Amino acid sequence: MHPDVQDAFDIARRDFRSCITEHGILAGRHHLNFYKARNAMFASLGANSMGEFTASWKSIELFLSMQRDDGLIPHRITSKLKPHYHHLVTEPLDGNALVIIALRDYLDKANDLQFIEKNFKSAKKAIEWLRGHDTDRDLLLEEPFFAGWQETILKSGKVLYSNCLYFKALKDFAVLANAVGEEKVSEEYERLARRVSEQINSKFWQGNYYCDWIGAIKHDSFSTDGNVLAALFGIADREQSQMIQNKIRQHQLNKVPLQANYPMYPFWRIPPGLLAVDAYNYHNGSSWFWIGCLNSIALSNMGLRKEAKQELKTIARLIKENGSVHEVFLHGKPIKSVFLKSEPFYSWNSALFLKAVNEV
């Protein structure tokens, strides 16, 4: 292992473990001192890669224990264990997809079938809740504003990121169903996953990348989150995945792996109240290590191991330079303003860096 990567690995492991509590995985240890579904579920993938299975299953169990009767899991749970199901006025979609993905990964790594059997009914409710958000019955999910991870950007309709997670959740639920002896259910969800993948390619593919989202019109900005997930999950074939990597290099989005989008979203895509607190760049032209780490795994899966390792070295040097695994970067530095500061001990990034180093 490269010395910079080893040093960064040690820092990331320290930061990640500092976010583990008796209840699960916190989003961070400073101003993000709470449990957030997308953060915890993505972080559980890193926990599993490290053999930290207790942190993984406790995080999954925490959110499923507070699942609403209709199947929605909490968006956020406070440090005092009070659940919140909305972001502003919206019920985010990705937590429900990610809890299924986390369950499948936990089964694969920990081989704990008993835990899956215990939570299968809750998983089924979670995936059925997601299916209910295909409002126009075209197999793709529709969402209102603020329902995905880019909570400061006004997007609505069919969003690439959410639909890639939906595809993966359908595939993984099919595996869970088969594991508990529900073969017919497994076959149903495997078929549905294939059809969703076909629809993503039909609706989103632009010839050399997937568009960002489809509302009243098609928004053809390049979002690295969904494009990387499409390559990682096998929605994109080998040729498409290479085109996505070409697009990333063309716009130098891997200088700080990985810049979230290109080009910049216009100012009117950010709610005015957030502009007032310096949030213009929070999800707009900024860089997030979790996307870079998943991209390094995607590159490795494509056989581009040299490029994958280089991406990890770039991330590692920034981790060493800052002495911790920060949340979000702009122009090579952690975001820091009067109102907005990057979380310095960010579990989502640190856990996926650990996963990427273990797999690349």
Place the predicted regions along the sequence by residue.
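Well-ordered alpha-helical scaffold segments within catalytic/enzyme domains
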Residues: 1, 41-53, 98-115, 165-183, ...
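Extended glycan-interaction surfaces of carbohydrate-active proteins
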Residues: 1-34, 58-91, 132-158, 195-288, ...
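Short coil/turn segments at secondary-structure boundaries
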Residues: 31, 47-51, 83-94, 110, ...
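Beta-strand-rich domains and repeat architectures in extracellular enzymes and scaffolds
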Residues: 33-41
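An active-site-proximal structural segment forming one wall of the substrate-binding cleft
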Residues: 119-134
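Active-site neighborhood of glycoside hydrolase catalytic domains
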Residues: 161-203
